[in-house]
Curated annotation (Swiss-Prot):
Residues 1-253 are annotated as: Methyltransferase domain. InterPro entries: 4pyrrol_Mease (IPR000878), 4pyrrol_Methylase_sf (IPR035996), 4pyrrole_Mease_sub1 (IPR014777). Fusion protein of the methyltransferase cmiM and a type I borosin core peptide; part of the gene cluster that mediates the biosynthesis of a type I borosin, a highly methylated cyclic peptide with potent biological activities. Type I borosins derive from the C-terminus of the fusion protein, and it is the same protein that methylates its own C-terminus using S-adenosyl methionine (SAM). The C-terminus is subsequently cleaved off and macrocyclized by a prolyloligopeptidase to give the final product. It comes from the Eukaryota. The modification N-methylisoleucine is found at I384, I385. Within the homodimer, the clasp domain wraps around the adjacent subunit to position the core peptide into the other subunit's active site for iterative intermolecular methylation. In the N-terminal section; belongs to the precorrin methyltransferase family. The modification N-methylthreonine is found at T382. Pathway: Secondary metabolite biosynthesis. It comes from Coprinellus micaceus (Glistening ink-cap mushroom). This is Methyltransferase/ribosomally synthesized type I borosin cyclic peptide precursor cmiMA.
Length: 389
């Protein structure tokens, strides 16, 4: 359950610092950091650490809880408890964790679950993960053929299924089978790496390609995206390039044939086999007859009747900006929505009504010409990959 009893004063907010130094921190995360009583963080670089301390001097580094004589699980338990102790003291605690704070991060989920079970307000704000960076740098859309993400050791230990027809992303390929912690792992300690290659070769064959990917931490770096065959990854000079922050991307086997549900297609009224457009379909061309026709029509396009532009002036815009970026303002709003709206100047009656109601349809509609609630379908920007037409 996301909602929790507000009877207890302490609260916990978990945010992500992203991958790239400082620049991946969201406005929402920065606002949470600035307004916290105390910030507990585990981040990947000194620049982000200094930025957090600049935004909130009452910040503590949890990285010191790691130890080379400790199991990582014990460290994660301690990290969670370090934050929970302060929540129980009635403090507004913010935990900042590298990447997305809920993706391959154990202490955040533990702390949130315990805080909620004890009646404290607790939530997680999203951040950018290594996988998000991988999708951007390698030009991959996971929806094109589906995508499965595994932690490398988990894949092996639990015999997770591999679907060669979909994208596969593997985390922590540089520490296969490792449960301990070291401040400086070397590639020759990744002694179980060949077990991972054996599993991949079983599913894809030795000549299938794998992209070794490392997202850049600083703006001075470029992403690392090196393509090797599974067989090449067994070579010592290649294996030595695999680090603790390495991620593998395994593309689908192009030889895998698509299986259509013809009964379902018939029920949808589709009489032909769906196609996948360029660039997801390597056999498609970027400028075929259909694409050329669509581009020709672009010159004479006019906004359709259902399109509603943003109002040129709206007092509601400034109010929503404050509510998004200032937690104390949001607290005032939640205490009494009607009183909050009545105390504002420059809003129309429709905008006040939308603010009190607070749902996305009414608010989105109040910002657009016409003031009427927005159809939920218009709020979803769906870029469909599979062509059914």
């Amino acid at each position: 359950m996301i909602g929790a009893s507000l009877a207890k004063k302490g609260q916990l907010t978990i945010v992500g610092s992203g991958i790239a130094s400082i620049s991946h921190l969201t406005l929402q995360a920065v606002s949470a950091i600035e307004n916290a009583d105390i910030v507990c963080y585990v981040v990947a670089d000194g620049a982000t650490e200094a930025f957090i301390r600049k935004k909130n001097p009452n910040s503590l580094d949890l990285y010191h809880l790691y130890g080379e004589d400790k199991q990582r699980t014990d460290t994660y338990i301690q990290m969670a408890e370090f934050m929970l102790i302060r929540v129980r003291q009635g403090q507004n605690v913010v935990g900042v964790f590298y990447g997305h704070p809920g993706v391959f991060v154990c202490p955040t989920h533990r702390a949130l679950y315990i805080a909620r079970s004890e009646g404290y307000k607790a939530r997680m704000l999203p951040g950018l993960s290594a996988e998000d960076c991988l999708f951007a740098d390698l030009g991959i859309d996971p929806s094109s053929v589906g995508c499965v993400t595994y932690e490398a050791t988990d894949l092996l230990v639990f015999k997770r299924p591999i679907n060669p027809a979909s994208h596969l992303v593997l985390y922590q390929v540089g520490i296969v089978g490792k449960s301990n912690f070291k401040f400086d792992y070397t590639s020759d300690e990744n002694i179980h790496f060949t077990k991972l290659l054996d599993r991949l070769e079983e599913a894809y064959g030795p000549e299938h390609s794998v992209t070794h990917y490392i997202a850049p931490l600083f703006p001075t770096e470029d992403p690392i995206a090196e393509e090797y065959t599974i067989a090449q990854l067994r070579l010592p000079e290649i294996r030595d390039k695999i680090h603790t922050i390495s991620t593998f991307y395994v593309p689908p086997k192009t030889s895998e044939s698509l299986i259509y549900d013809e009964v379902l297609l018939a029920s949808l009224g589709v009489t032909h086999k769906p196609s996948v457009p360029y660039p997801w379909n390597p056999e498609a061309t970027p400028y075929g007859p259909r694409e050329k026709k669509a581009i020709e029509l672009l010159a004479e396009h006019e906004p359709p009747k259902g399109y509603r532009p943003l109002k040129e002036r709206s007092g509601l815009l400034a109010v929503l900006e404050k509510l998004c970026l200032e937690p104390l303002e949001m607290k005032k709003y939640n205490e009494d929505r009607q009183a909050y709206a009545d105390g504002l100047k420059g809003l129309t009656e429709n905008e006040k009504e939308a603010l009190v109601k607070g749902d996305h349809r009414t608010l989105a509609g109040a910002l657009k010409v016409g003031d009427t609630p927005t159809n939920p379908a218009a709020l979803v920007f769906t870029f469909i990959i599979t062509r059914l037409d």
